[in-house]
Amino acid sequence: MDGYNQQQQQQQQQQQQHQMNLGSSGGILHSPQQQQQQQQQQQQQQQQPMNGSNNQLLGISNGGFGTMLQQSASLPINIQGSNSFSTFTPLSADDSNLKKRKIKNEDGTYSEIPYSPNSLVGSNGGLDSSFLMLQQQLQDQQQQIAQFNSSVNSPSFSLNSSQVNNNNNNNNNINNNNNSNNNINNNNSNNNINNNNNNNNNNNNNINNNNINNNNNYNNNNNNNNHNHLQTTTTTTTNNGLTINANNTPSQLSSSSLYPGIIPQISITNTQSGYTPRSISPNPSPNLSPTNSPIQSPHLPTDNYLMIGSENENSDPPSPMTQYNENPPFTWTDYKSEPWYTTFNTNGDEMPVPLLNIMASKGFSYIGGQWIYCRRNHFQLDITAVYPKLFQETQYGHNGVTLSNSSSSVDPTQTPSYMLISGVKTPINGLTLTIKGIKNRADMSQQESEVELFQTNSKREKQGEHAPKPVAIQFGSLVSIQRLHFRKATLNNARRHGQPNPHQEFNQLVVSLYGRCMGQEYCIVSYVSPALIVRTATQVTPPGDLSPVHTPDYAGTSSNNGGGSNNMNCFGPTISNIDFSTMNIVSPGHSPTSPRPLSQLTSQGQTNILRLTQNHNNNNNNNNNNNNNNNNNNNNNNNNNINNNNNSNNNSLGNINNNNSNMLTSSSLLNGRINCFNNNINNNNNNQHNNNNQHNNNNNHHNINNQHNNQNNNNNNNNNNKCHWNSGDTEKSIVYNGKVGINVENPAYALSVQGTIYASEGVYHPSDLRIKYDLKSIDSKSNLDNVNRMKLYDYKYNPQWTHMNGRDPYLDNCDRGVIAQDLQRILPNAVRTIGNKNVNGQEIENLLVIKNEALVMETIGATQELSKQMDEMKLKLITYESKLKNLKKKSKNQTILLIIFMITFLLVALYMYKPSTHHSHHRRHNFDNNDN
């Protein structure tokens, strides 16, 4: 420890000696008395209260840059050419003043503003020279920077190489306390002391980037009031150097104080009606909501849920910038075109009305006091259904007198289980979300008129368009309804005399939450969007004109809260926000991508100052001593994904140039394009990169590797316990090895389904002879006997059981079949148990199920037996028929013989009768003759 103190003292002495040498030779540093005065001024400003708790304005007062530059004869400025910003073009003042642009005022009139830089008037007066003179002076400064760099690189001007190398290549953290005696506590050592800067910070994600290059210390520290604000503190220089105010409180930054007589006062172009130039390149604004979308509902208390409602006492307070013509939120209101039904939890307790947190992140613009939508674009709705955490519960007596008032707290993500329908608690079978488009109605008593709202496929093909289908939702989970658009535009979109058409037609979106009970859908809650004007195409204005602020379209997402940007920290402004042709700095919050301006003019002669917005990014530890914090934050942001963690660490190292360039931009005004003191900013970035690399090589690389291995092991263990779906060998197929349950918590079989199964082509079972043995024939008489012993019943299912199976418990509960207990006595192998089953809170032990295939096989056997019996009956019938035929033939022959016999008998009798008659007549004749 003594050796470390001695080393500190030696470094302090070397630092003071080096300062004295530089001061005596006309160097860069101030005298000790001047440094002491500046440090005392810094301590006084530290004790002053900060103006505003959430929004700190970044700038450098005249005591900083202005004081130094008034003392210096010339400032070496090196402006590198780049395609990322506009270059200066020689224009005469007269020609540039001829070009003017129109600005629309609040009263509908237009005013003209010239494009020339001469039209820019600062708080300190107008321009001292024309734009051409300004360009010539800047070119002269480019020549001076070469001489200045050569003088800096000279041996008399060089610093101790070991000290510079230690600051640029080693992980040596400088903790500049700025004491009154101007003693620099340089805690640099080759032993890589761990994070000495954290002693002065209050558990914030502070950015502490320390460098010493030519005795210019860029020490960027965050405030200690739990807000990530940027402070720029460096030591001051005397001659031919850059002076930065070494104060902990941010001061005002103005171009006139930086370059008096050279660059005019810089102000932000802004109008009273909230318009911005369309030509500015869009950049994500960090002053957005946690969901990176301004078109949303107010927030739920203490959570990031987007609560919807016209009256919300518990919502977050509005932004302090609402007084500057901020766009109103895309507010959804209650829509009670049909009754809302009360819901209950699993315990039967009444629940409050659910909240639909709807976020419309794409497709809508606020123009002229109306929400505009282009029908050729698509929009997306992200919806979450939750219960409010706190709600008021009031009990009333029979005479309407209030008995008690109490507030209850509920779990926002719990799912409703019952719904009150006609005074009866009915189980809820499922929850669905529906979306539709309607025409705006002045009176709710008018009939609702729907408009065509379509949803396209991922390829956005017209053939794939269809009306939005109901989407299943669970409480607490996010559901995204994508690629929605209106088919037709609204009527009377044309304006009359510069005013909205009095006959303008509007469309609205309706989002409803339905619960399915007894085969029908019942509305639980419903919301309607603001009135929308649907246009065929967006209105195109000339480039010089001013267009309204547009809604951002965040196509990309990131694990960081950077508005879809890959940067770890989104500080503004960036290089794309500076228009060098007019020397206007456009605030990122006032760019076309954000409807909320960060700053706005209160008067034409007042100078706007840059404001560093609150950084909500958790990955602010992109410095040389917070690798462990980076690992933790990356694990939290990237869901403990080791790949994303490593990528985030690489991004944090790779994006140091961007982040630190943005931080130092506010102090140098040109976003790192002015390379002062032999490119100290690049050295600062390289220092951070090398410091991080060396620090990781010494300490954190092993920790990160160990953490990487541990996380891989944990992930492997977790993955072993999770379900894995794999793609099959054939096209469009998936494979899962295990038991699958549909509406079944603990499936006992490979596929357990609580409901109805539909198969258009049937179900096939293996029945190959090669997988069977010990075949025995079955007497079909036994099958017939078993079927005859079975009893069929007409019965009704329990309503709770019917509801569990997705059927109407009152209209679709009748069926016909056998009873498992009866079948078990006849066919024991056809009945099994699946264990206990809970039906509406009632436990059923050893629920019996039957195997329908066994009944089918018994029926087949019985049918075969009946077939055999029928065959036997047929044989008997044939025999009896042949016998009957023989009998018929015999009887016929007998009849013929009998007839013949009868005829013969009659003939014989007749013949015998005639002779006897003739003989008696002859005898009588003879007797008569004898008498005579």
From Swiss-Prot:
SUPFAM superfamilies: p53-like transcription factors. It is a single-pass membrane protein. One of its GO terms (molecular function) is sequence-specific DNA binding. Residues 1-19, 33-48, 152-249, 277-294, 615-660, 680-721 have a biased composition (Low complexity). Its main location: membrane. Disruption phenotype: Null cells are delayed in multicellular development and highly defective in pstA-specific gene expression. Residues 286-546 bind DNA. Residues 49-59, 311-328 have a biased composition (Polar residues). It comes from the Eukaryota. Residues 127-154, 863-895 form a coiled coil. Residues 1-63, 152-256, 269-328, 540-568, 582-601, 613-660, 680-726 are annotated as: Disordered. GO terms for cellular component: cytoplasm; endoplasmic reticulum membrane; nucleus. Transcription factor which acts as a key regulator of pstA (prestalk-A) cells differentiation. Essential for ecmA-specific gene expression. This is Myelin gene regulatory factor-like A. The gene is mrfA.
